């Protein structure tokens, strides 16, 4: 017999600096910051996608420094479109070419404030095999490849139909990272502060950094939308 030493994701309280069992977690309504973020495509078998953007949505902006991949649904239909008109308050830019799930087109346009588009191409997720992107923080030291991977946990309930994957922050993300030999980075210390893996955000607390992350994304022309969502969120019973 052989021994195996590895790791697994656990729920963690940054206040008590301890792991939590499922039975110790209570769920309460919580208002989270939400963001839509652009990832620039550097390599793809879909030639129209190269040098354009894949759009992701997340309720945890603080996990962006931990991003190492994007995930798509193999049998989901995606579209590539060019933005032609936006409303006055939108952060989206006319002329940008963006990829999202076809079924979520209307909800994405309404939320972001896009009023007119031209669809350039439609395709199934399975055609995204071997696609790669830059990290949105590439210009501030995140100079590694972000792989675009197939995953069975991608749904069309909300967002863009593409999931941002941070292998150090959740079970689905971690398992996908292990399966695809991703760099499993945990950029957060036991007390909830960023470590050296988070580059310019070192020392910032993840509970307080969402707007700072969003502002940096906006500065780098990667932020398309900043909003809020009330949803059920885990809390320590202590």
What is the meaning of each model-derived region?
Residues 138:
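Glycine-rich, acidic and aromatic/proline-enriched surface loops and short helix-turn segments
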Residues 78-80, 87-135:
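Carboxylate/His-rich catalytic cores and anion/metal-binding grooves
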Residues 2-65, 79, 84-89, 127-133, ...:
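Residue patterns forming the tRNA-binding/recognition surfaces of aminoacyl-tRNA synthetases
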Residues 147-149:
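C-terminal accessory/binding modules appended to enzymatic or scaffolding proteins
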């Amino acid at each position: 017999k052989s021994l195996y030493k590895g790791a697994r994701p656990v729920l963690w309280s940054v206040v008590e600096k301890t792991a939590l069992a499922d039975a110790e977690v209570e769920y309460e309504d919580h208002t989270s910051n939400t963001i839509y973020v652009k990832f620039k495509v550097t390599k793809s078998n879909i030639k129209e996608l190269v040098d354009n953007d894949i759009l992701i949505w997340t309720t945890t902006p603080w996990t962006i420094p931990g991003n190492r991949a994007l995930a798509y649904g193999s049998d989901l239909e995606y579209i590539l479109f060019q933005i032609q008109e936006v409303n006055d308050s939108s952060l989206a830019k006319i002329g940008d070419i963006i990829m999202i799930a076809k079924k979520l087109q209307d909800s994405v346009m309404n939320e972001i404030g896009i009023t007119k588009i031209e669809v350039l191409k439609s395709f199934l997720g399975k055609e995204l095999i071997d696609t790669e992107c830059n990290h949105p923080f590439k210009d501030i030291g995140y100079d590694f490849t972000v792989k675009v991977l197939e995953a069975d946990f991608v749904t069309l309930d909300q967002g863009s139909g593409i999931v941002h994957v941070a292998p150090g922050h959740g079970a689905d993300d971690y398992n996908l990272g292990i399966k695809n030999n991703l760099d499993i980075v945990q950029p957060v210390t036991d007390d909830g502060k960023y470590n050296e893996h988070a580059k310019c955000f070192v020392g910032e607390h993840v509970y307080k950094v969402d707007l700072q992350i969003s502002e940096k994304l906006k500065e780098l022309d990667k932020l398309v939308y900043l909003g809020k969502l009330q949803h059920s969120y885990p809390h320590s019973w202590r």
